[in-house]
């Protein structure tokens, strides 16, 4: 894809967000922000019986990159386990979004993934504590 294609994709996900809205019930629910840009993202995830993400949604406000990235992330992480989410690479996400386009705003681009990784770690720790 060229720069224009990446910009078009980001604008499409910003203007027509996929999986936007709260999710009830949700096993994971976490929020975070990027004070420098005023971005806010809240992610909701529901897991199936095998520990895979069966539903993932987001709510938020902020710049095009943070909101489009959160929307794209809801599709990328669908079907993954929490361990797979924790292993997701920020670099890979930036490549999917278009490195040339989002490289000036990496914190905006990776905000959703940071929140999801943190929520996955917290959930996994709580599950382990409950089992011991």
Where are the regions a protein language model picked out?
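C-terminal binding/interaction regions
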Residues: 1-24, 29-30, 54-55, 80-132
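Short beta-strand elements
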Residues: 34, 39-49
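Short, thiol/selenol-centered motifs that function as redox-active sites or metal-ligating centers
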Residues: 37, 60-68
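Short, glycine/acidic-enriched capping/hinge loops at junctions between secondary-structure elements
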Residues: 42-44, 56, 69
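A cross-family signal for key residues in well-ordered alpha-helices
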Residues: 44, 74, 117
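Immediate flanking context of iron-sulfur cluster ligation sites
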Residues: 51-60
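Catalytic-loop motifs flanking and including active-site residues across diverse enzymes
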Residues: 65-70, 108-111
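Alpha-helical support elements that line or immediately flank enzyme active sites
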Residues: 69-80
């Amino acid at each position: 894809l060229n720069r224009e294609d990446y910009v078009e994709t980001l604008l499409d996900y910003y203007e027509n967000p996929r999986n936007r809205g709260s999710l009830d019930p949700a096993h994971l629910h976490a929020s975070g922000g990027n004070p420098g840009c005023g971005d806010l993202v809240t992610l909701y995830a529901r897991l199936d019986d095998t520990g895979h993400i069966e539903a993932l949604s987001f709510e938020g406000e902020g710049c095009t990159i943070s909101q489009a990235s959160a929307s794209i992330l809801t599709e990328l992480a669908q079907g993954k386990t929490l361990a797979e989410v924790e292993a997701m690479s920020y670099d890979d996400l930036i490549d999917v979004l278009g490195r040339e386009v989002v490289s000036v705003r990496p914190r905006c681009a990776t905000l959703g993934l940071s929140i999801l990784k943190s929520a996955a770690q917290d959930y996994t720790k709580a599950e382990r504590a409950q089992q011991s």
